[in-house]
């Protein structure tokens, strides 16, 4: 049914495609002078619901499903960081994902602020809650943009306000790395069973006791503990962790989604019949308890560097093409060698904080592409191996950052329906469902991002033999 609906308007969309040219840009990088201390600040802004009668569609599972109530409102959280020179912003939005067009609007709104504060890089990512308002446009009725314009304006305003507040909150302190492994909480819904079960914490401890501490928490799981029947607005477990840490310690929290493709989820912690809000409560409590259990930390030397590169991703997915030219997806499209004749312009980045490097990935990357476990000969070199060659000791993933390309799938395990490519899913010979490919740009995305990762690392590190 879905296939026939989209095929009915595909031809008319293609006939209206504009002719665009390539817009490749040189990589950008900044390496801060040797610092004596860390400077960080945090701010958080609620994203209010618009006072309109226009529908608010929930982001995930089914199209055209409207939000019926509120558990907790989405927020924009921001952290400023520097080592005494130019600064960097990380802005985390409690939402399912953001296209590069929305990210660029936030950057444009902050352009004067960045000049005034010597901010060299603004990076915006989504925590990937599936209980938020549709911010990508994919969950409206068929062929209808699911985004609510007024809500998107509120989101951008909250992100900008949080960014400015984070700078105003800037204070001096030290930065510590700690880890823990929450017990039996994750599972992978697709073979191979590969995921990173470690919860990583970067904890900023201010020199003055009157300043709040800041915790950056990286964990690789879809934020969907409320599951698919839910129609209540919520930040899901990233919000529950933030609230729990605040109540227990007074510290502020910025949640970073890791390598969640594949599809990595938290287990259900309640018995039948399933109680969504109770499952959220238990998941949040389990993760908060895990964070508070971290008792061994390593202090990071105050060094900061960042690099990014525009990447042209061949667009093979005809459904994404339709969304793009119906105005649902706002990613820039250029002439390219994708099966559609186009490429999407995206962005990959790296942020090095002491001996910890954050890979800023524009989508939901499969964990195999990071660890190397379960990869085949046709797959790119895993990001962890590339990082090791550049002397990187600790590699963390920040998914859905500065763009949302969908799932980033290993080529060796990439399968599409030959009768309805990207429109309908397919099972392989083992019965494995290859759903994720229908929400991906194409088979070459993983390799191109790995190449870009190598290139931008070379701007801020010295490769080892």
Predicted regions and their residues:
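C-terminal motif of bacterial Sec signal peptides marking the signal peptidase cleavage site
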Residues: 18-22
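Bacterial N-terminal signal peptides that target proteins for export
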Residues: 1-10
């Amino acid at each position: 049914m879905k296939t026939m609906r989209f095929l009915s308007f595909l031809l008319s969309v293609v006939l209206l495609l504009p002719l665009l040219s390539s817009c490749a840009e040189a990589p950008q990088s900044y390496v801060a002078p040797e610092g004596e201390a860390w400077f960080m600040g945090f701010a958080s802004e609620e994203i209010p619901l618009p006072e309109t009668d226009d529908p608010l569609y929930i982001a995930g599972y089914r199209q055209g499903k409207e939000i019926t109530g509120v558990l907790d409102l989405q927020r924009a959280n921001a952290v400023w960081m520097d080592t005494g020179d130019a600064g960097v912003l990380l802005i985390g939005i409690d939402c399912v994902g953001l296209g590069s067009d929305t990210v660029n609007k936030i950057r444009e709104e902050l352009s004067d602020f960045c000049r005034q504060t010597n901010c060299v890089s603004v990076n915006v990512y989504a925590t990937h809650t599936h209980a938020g308002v549709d911010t990508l446009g994919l969950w409206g009725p068929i062929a209808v943009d699911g985004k609510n314009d007024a809500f998107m304006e509120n989101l951008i305003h909250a992100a900008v306000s949080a960014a400015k507040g984070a700078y105003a909150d800037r204070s001096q302190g030290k930065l510590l790395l700690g880890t823990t492994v929450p017990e039996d909480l994750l599972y992978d819904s697709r073979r191979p069973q590969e995921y990173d079960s470690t919860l990583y914490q970067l904890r900023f401890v201010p020199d003055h006791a009157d300043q709040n501490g800041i915790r950056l928490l990286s964990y690789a799981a879809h934020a969907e503990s409320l599951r698919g029947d839910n129609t209540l607005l919520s930040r899901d477990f990233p919000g529950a962790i933030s609230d729990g840490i605040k109540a227990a310690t007074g510290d502020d929290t910025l949640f970073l989604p890791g390598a969640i493709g594949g599809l990595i989820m938290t287990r259900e912690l309640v018995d039948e019949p399933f109680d969504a809000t109770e499952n959220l409560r238990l998941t949040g409590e389990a993760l908060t308890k895990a964070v508070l259990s971290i008792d061994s930390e390593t202090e990071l030397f105050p060094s900061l560097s960042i690099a990014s590169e525009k990447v042209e991703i061949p667009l093979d997915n005809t459904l994404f093409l339709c969304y793009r030219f119906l105005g649902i997806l706002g990613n820039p499209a250029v002439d390219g060698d994708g099966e559609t004749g186009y490429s999407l312009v995206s962005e990959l980045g790296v942020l090095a904080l002491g001996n910890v490097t954050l890979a800023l990935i524009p989508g939901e990357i499969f964990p195999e592409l990071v660890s190397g476990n379960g990869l085949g000969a046709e797959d790119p070199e895993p990001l962890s191996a590339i990082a090791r060659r550049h002397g990187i000791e600790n590699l963390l993933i920040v998914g859905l950052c500065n763009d949302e390309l969908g799932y980033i799938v290993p080529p060796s395990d990439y399968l599409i329906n030959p009768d309805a490519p990207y429109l309908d899913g397919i099972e392989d010979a083992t019965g494995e469902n290859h759903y994720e490919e229908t929400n991906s740009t194409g088979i070459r995305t993983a390799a191109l991002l790995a190449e870009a990762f190598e290139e931008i690392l070379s701007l801020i590190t010295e490769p080892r033999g």
